[in-house]
């Protein structure tokens, strides 16, 4: 038979480690295994069927089970909800086994919630009927409790003379009928008396300011009683104060808080003896605190952590994943400005100090009990809340709440303490102190801050000392012991090292968790770093590695203290968070990784925020002006009225600066908040541009692709109102369209294109938006750009966008790019107007072809222009003074006319047009009184709109016939008026064309690429050029040594020569090695000969024999080498004369061999002469006679036909012949040099010495021409890519004296604009001089 749980898998856990829970768990595990079930040791998503809770109790007191309690219960609950696996009571297993079946109805066993507070409570899912009964019982009990507490509240209000204020939402007193009636009546009275109350309050404040200063002294209950007996004025003061307070109501109708003035506790005008308190009444053995006494208090710089915490004002936010929201603003007073300090316990008991130092306290003490919301407490310095109590600092220590462990500062059950109207106290079960009590009147040290734990408190004085009181069962007071007794007396926490008598710890900041405390010691080392001390519970490692009931130094893994500089410290229930910077955070205990990650992403330094403990999570109290406004704007619970008003207050304040506005404008674009953006624009008109990046709000609107619908709101507002330029450039010369291409924002790019942005502006890298979109592989956006006029312009690497595309995308974009509806013909002087014209045409979906973007250096510009005219349907000619005289513009128009294109002129300037040019136009737009140059921007757009409509009608084949008739009549009338002019008058109105024109170019063949580029630039500027290529003819690739063919050939020859050199080096090395080998052999032979001679080294014959042998063998070796060399020479037939010498040397060598044998000692002949061993060398001298090619004979005469002899003419003819001989090499060029207006020399580092000589010769010839006044007639300039060549010593002075122009990628347009202007001046001058000469 199959087992009951055979197919089921269970995961079991118990909430504590107690023996009772452990026993239940073991029994359940055995029962599951016996019945065939599988026990798992972790929850698995797809296999676990049930999660079983093995609990002996339904509620666990954390104080009793603290060390045995396991904190995984809440994690199991969250995991069960996320995976959909139910958590059941162990009774489910017992009932299933008892009934022998799997129970399907789980309502009676399911755990619906786990309440993790002081009591760990497991709530079960009750059946529906039982739930209804329980709800009815709970309602009855709540009504009874409300009625009982209602009476106590009425007594409380009567005692304090206060009206019962409305209670916050969720309060158990909310539904009390008597209070609601009283509230309604009081609300009416407050509205009627509002103005009167305001005047009274203002008068009272003036009186308080006029009062003389006095010292405040806190005394014990016993001392106060004595003074009351002797001073009747004291009693009357309290009575009057209470009576006066009855008339003071909260003027703000929206406040849900009762008001208690802290002046009741501080500014008490008593006649008190200033003598020291007697010992009987001095409960803490501390004398009076005198403000004038010098207590050697350290400087306030020690309290940097505390000062940063209390000097700023802000708002509280909480992170929800990566989003942010304003924290529970409904629980706060409705009209407070901002928060200085905020704390909240896990039960919801909260305290807050606002910007005007008012203190508010509200929230739960237990699940069914709440402290009434206390109103503004003036001049409160500090406050803190624990689990069920609160402590405030205001010239003393004030407490309120539960006093189970003496955490209020007095013995449990004692209600006889001063404050809030004498001894009148209200108690509501379990020692809950509902009114504020002043404790420890004789504690006369100045308190700077206080921090509350769960049931204990720690305070810090201005002397850097720490005191504590309250519960101490886990050593949380730092007194060196742990007990469960009441510790209501304030005691000093000792930080001194018992082994170091000089140790004197100065504490600057404190923070308390659930049952542990942390203190910061400032400037504890010479490097200015801070050190952390901790004590109390260490259940989760929140104070380091070990538990301690006294302060211990928190160390790292290397047992060294951490090095922090003014860190931000916060303690939660079982965690210590230390933040040195938002990027450098350390946690001890339970981790909060997501919260720390949000800190890193949203903050830069600690001055911008503080960390606060909220009921269910950790929040941030934001101080930074920008971050406050930004978080409000980004808040998930954003309210158009409430949040907007808070943001408005922030923006209108003086603290809100321009840098804040720039960043907030970016947030407005991201979240589409136009109202806040208008606020920013109102305060900083036209000044929301980032001063660092130069980004405008139009740039910001392109950054958020996911929120393009929200960004669109800000974008259209800026464009419609023309607040910022649509082509605003940032620091990298990027426009908003560049940003759209980079971030793929198709929707925003469409808006920018429709609004007429410039499609072809380049950034610093020379890239257009089309470059970027193609490189981002955004084909949809690339096609959009091409359809709206983006051109294929090269970047700085001379690559156009199509070169970055794949083959299929490239063909698609090419089809779009080369289908241009409009071809614009213009002069380059009018390029600024033409760019605007192209942009305006783009507004009406017309693509335009411009040579500025199509023609590049090295391309076939004739073919490109021809392709542009052929692929277009309409040609627009821009008429100006320059364009009507441009030869290239006329050629373009003539070609368009031949191809049958429609030609439409646009009058940029009012000029007279000759009939030939006029006859090329197809349409003449309606003439206006103004030219385009004289029109405003709106008028230009209006006229372009009409021309665009005409072009669209032509493209669609629906042009207006009436328009044609009018234009034909205009053309006929114009032709008639032209025919009435005489031929001479017509030519007088036209520019004269003379043969003396153009620019003569000199260049080196090595610079042919640069020369071609310069020629194209001259042609773009309508300057005719001529060079040796046109005169002599461009050399072929084989004749040109710098052609690609010859360069490759030279490279190949160099490679062959390199190989030969390597082989030669190897051969020489072998020969050298052989030579060394021969020398070694000779040496060995000589040594052997000497050994055979049996001569000793001291013998004179030994030395003679040794020298003889060395000379003999060397001679033999030299002759052998010479023979080999001569044989090689003989084979090559290089030298015939050396052959006889070789034979003679061989003969001498053979004769010398008769005198010795290699194996014997040589026989010395008496007739031996060493001179016979020498070689005889013959030399001959060659005499070269140089004859003069020209013999100048002064005595010789020249005879002419007339028979006369003229010595003067002879010398003149001689000079002419010499000049002709000097310029003979440039004979073909002389005529063109003479007829040119401008002479341009290309001079680079590749220019050879020969070319420089040619340059000098041609320059000298050009300078030989003089005008009538004897001045130089030719203008000569030098173009160079390197201006330092002008100062080079190798550059001839005749070239140095000329005008030099340096060209590079940045100023090339400006250089040629200047050259063009120079040429036009020369041309005009020539025309005027020709006219003058013709008139003569």
Curated annotation (Swiss-Prot):
It is an enzyme of class 3 (hydrolase). Induction: Down-regulated by Pseudomonas aeruginosa, PAO1 strain and up-regulated by PA14 strain infection. PROSITE patterns: ANK_REP_REGION, ANK_REPEAT, BRCT, RCC1_2, RCC1_3, TIR. Disruption phenotype: Mutant S cells are killed by an avirulent Legionella strain that does not kill wild-type Dictyostelium. These results indicate that, although TirA is not required for S cell differentiation, it is critical for the effective response of S cells to bacteria. Show growth attenuation correlated with a discernable loss of cell viability. In addition, tirA mutant cells appeared to be more sensitive to killing by Legionella. The gene is tirA. RCC1 repeats lie at residues 412-462, 463-522, 529-581. This is Protein tirA. SMART domains: ANK (SM00248), BRCT (SM00292), TIR (SM00255). GO terms for biological process: asexual reproduction; defense response; defense response to bacterium; phagocytosis; response to lipopolysaccharide; signal transduction. It catalyses: NAD(+) + H2O = ADP-D-ribose + nicotinamide + H(+). ANK repeats lie at residues 732-761, 765-795.
